[in-house]
Amino acid sequence: MATLTEDDVLEQLDAQDNLFSFMKTAHTILLQGIRQFLPSLFVDNDEEIVEYAVKPLLAQSGPLDDIDVALRLIYALGKMDKWLYADITHFSQFWHYLNEQDETPGFADDMTWDFISNVNSITRNAMLYDALKAMKFADFSVWSEARFSGMVKTALTLAVTTTLKELTP
């Protein structure tokens, strides 16, 4: 499995022109980051253990291929902070929600605002979050949906890259 560089992540996310494709790509990237992190959980990397126990667990059809199961394991073993666990879970849940919708909301919709208002890696960045809030609740003459959508996309991209940096073993 190839390791994604920050440039790869930025390129892939920037190429997405709507919220659905953005969240699908973000979900795939976060799952790949978790897959790359998982082997570091196993202390004894004896060849036999890796071959007969670790590899089957991490295989694409294995039990740890599910992002929610893998996250719970990482968190339960104390290898992930609560805020990070919450952010990745939140991304996963929002992606699953969008996947079930007939019409996907846009970057500037209230549903998306509710989502980003609960992403710790965005809300903990006071300058970014305050700028988003100011634009979201600004007088209409100042507010531009295209500008706000671009800013939301940037904030979500920063959240994904911040999360991936935390998943470095």
Swiss-Prot record:
Recorded superkingdom: Bacteria
**In its keyword annotation, does this UniProt entry include Lyase?**
yes
Name the chemical reaction catalysed here.
(S)-malate = fumarate + H2O
The EC number(s) this enzyme carries:
4.2.1.2
- Cited SUPFAM superfamilies: MtlR-like
Region forming the signal peptide: none
Question: Which top EC class applies here?
Answer: lyase
Cite the GO molecular-function annotations of the record: fumarate hydratase activity
Protein keywords = Lyase
Annotated function: In vitro catalyzes the addition of water to fumarate, forming malate. Cannot catalyze the reverse reaction. Cannot use the cis-isomer maleate as substrate.
Q: Which family does it belong to?
A: Belongs to the MtlR/FumE family.
The name this protein goes by in its record = Fumarase E
